[in-house]
Design a protein with these regions (language model features):
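Sec-dependent, cleavable N-terminal signal peptides
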Residues: 1-44
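Short conserved micro-motifs at the rims of enzyme active sites and ligand-binding pockets
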Residues: 3, 102-104, 262
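Intrinsically disordered, low-complexity segments of exported/surface proteins
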Residues: 10, 14, 91, 177, ...
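Short, surface-exposed loop and linker segments with low hydrophobicity and enrichment for Pro/Ser/Thr
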Residues: 20-24, 77-88, 158-162, 248-258, ...
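Sterically constrained small-residue positions within well-ordered secondary structures
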Residues: 34, 70, 82, 158-160, ...
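Signature of Gram-negative chaperone-usher
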Residues: 42-196
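Negatively charged
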Residues: 195-514
């Protein structure tokens, strides 16, 4: 990273004498821009910075100030900045030297107009002092030295054209001021904030469209990984970077090894905030349905908020390792792994789900997965868990005792069609906000003969105070028994009163966890 320094020049001050009392203030502007120079053609973005002040030479008629009622004056000036730097800029102000007074260089006695010594209003100035303030602040500040510059403005993003920052010079004079020329120099420094250039992926649906466009009827994509080298011109690569990306990202299919490669200069690629449907394969199309292996280790997901349907329909993928995924900003994981019908290994150990509100159909129809560890999941913000585990046909046990469901409103078919499930631990479920439990534990008629669920463990009765929709909650769960042995011959007729711990005098389909 290299700096670019621009000095916009200096102007000359005025005169202060017994006949016409003036002071002159010189303003120097230095702008510093962190610019990145690259020999590579894939760099798309270079930060720029320009700055100016509307007055570089301020002059005040001292006689007019002294003759005024309060012997004070306030002179406005504007610092104007324009930058496309995506992390903004910082502007500071200080005197050019450690001398902060306006100095009469011709005075034999060393006459000065001193800086104020503390923050104060203009009315509180002592005679023959001056200060500076930023924006709409009420108080003026002492003139800052180079060793402790004043922060004028600090932004976090690019400007929308020219951005004006208002300042004011304040002064109080008295008629005992010695005649002469009083001058000083103030320096504005404008520095673009540090910015690390990144490769940013296009939005998920757009990536999906471009990935599918690479797969002709005569070939298929079996693998997806990063290439160490750019594509050959014969590969007909497509661009998959976001418009805000600093680098190009190329995507192409090599038919010789049936691999979809991507390439960019940087080691890692930031996924778009909307990464929904990135590898989505529609149930009625053949595009990218034959992917067998994906290397996603160079993806940085720290900026992603939407991962809904991200891998939905990847029916031939057997292993998915997402241990490098940072999901701390994600709010939507609905359908994320739905219909991955051949998946047998899923690593979600790194998942931070503390911001997720939607987990509907997240694991829907993953029929071959035999174990699922979600003990690290924070579900405190989730409102929708409908169909979350629907048709996870190979799970025999599921421990959801760590789930915080205090904000969930929809649990319909959440645990439906789990035909090999024998026990279920819901010991910390809070259902006080749930309105819909339709078919929550049900089995479809076609799998009724495969019913294996025997125990559902809870700590307390379900809170059904807001439950309005609850048909077929236990449909076809004929092996299920409450802790005291209660059951119905036709479980489909169970109403919400069966969402209780079974005990003497109280029927229910739940068993209290010891």
């Amino acid at each position: 990273m290299k700096g670019q320094k621009t000095n916009l020049g200096e102007s000359h001050g005025g005169w202060l004498n017994r006949e016409i009392k003036l002071f002159g203030l010189f303003l120097t502007l230095i702008s510093l821009s962190n610019l990145i120079f690259s020999n590579n053609t894939l760099a798309l973005y270079t930060p720029t910075l320009s700055a100016s002040v509307d007055q570089t030479n301020l002059q005040v008629d001292g006689n007019q100030v002294i003759d005024s009622a309060d012997q004070t004056t306030e002179i406005p000036l504007n610092l104007i900045v324009n930058t496309n730097n995506r992390t903004g800029y910082t502007a500071t102000l200080n005197s050019k030297t450690d001398e902060t007074a306006l100095v009469n260089t011709e005075s034999a006695t060393g006459a000065k107009i001193d800086s104020i010594d503390a923050n104060k209003t203009l009315a509180g100035f002592s005679d023959n002092t001056w200060g500076v303030k930023v924006g709409s602040n009420t108080n003026f500040s002492p003139i800052p030295k180079p060793t402790a510059p004043m922060n004028v403005m600090q932004t976090a993003g690019k400007t929308n054209g020219n951005e004006s920052n208002q300042l004011s010079i304040g002064m109080k004079l008295s008629d005992n001021l010695e005649s002469g020329r009083y001058t000083n120099k103030l320096v504005f420094s404008i520095l673009t904030n540090d910015y690390n250039q990144i490769a940013m992926m296009t939005e998920g649906p757009d990536f999906n469209t471009k990935l599918k466009s690479l797969e002709p009827p005569t070939s298929e994509i079996n693998y997806f990984r990063k290439s160490p080298v750019p594509p050959a011109t014969s590969m007909n690569a497509v661009n998959i970077e976001d418009e805000e990306s600093d680098y190009e990202i190329k995507l192409w299919l090599d038919p010789t090894d049936k691999t979809a490669y991507y390439y960019t200069e940087t080691e890692k690629v930031y996924l778009n905030s909307d990464s929904s449907k990135m590898f989505y394969s529609d149930l009625y199309e053949q595009k990218i349905r034959n992917v067998l292996e994906m290397d996603l280790s160079n993806f940085d997901t720290s900026k992603v908020t939407n991962m809904s349907s991200m891998f939905l329909g990847m029916v031939n993928l057997t292993t998915l390792n997402l241990s490098n995924f940072n999901t701390s900003q994600v709010t939507n994981m609905g359908g994320m792994f739905g219909f991955m019908s051949n998946l047998t290994s899923l690593n979600l150990i790194s998942f931070d789900t503390s911001q997720v509100t939607n987990m509907a159909a997240m694991f829907f129809n993953i029929v071959l997965l035999t174990t699922l560890d979600l003990s690290n999941f924070n579900t405190s913000q989730v409102t929708n868990m409908s169909n979350m585990f629907n048709n996870m046909a190979s799970l025999t046990t599921l421990d959801l005792s760590s789930f915080d469901t205090s904000n969930v409103t929809d649990m319909r078919y959440m645990l439906s069609s789990m035909r090999n499930l024998t026990t279920l631990d819901l010991s910390n479920f809070n259902t006080s906000q749930v309105t819909n439990m339709n078919g929550m534990f049900s089995l479809p008629d076609m799998w009724a003969s495969n019913d294996k669920l025997e125990k559902i463990y809870v700590n307390n009765d379900f809170n059904t105070s807001k439950l309005t929709t609850f048909s077929n909650i236990f449909s076809n769960r004929k092996k299920l028994r409450g802790g005291n042995g209660s059951y119905l011959t036709d479980p489909s007729t169970a109403d919400k009163s069966w969402l209780r711990v079974d005990r003497p005098g109280v029927h229910g389909y739940f068993t209290k966890k010891s």
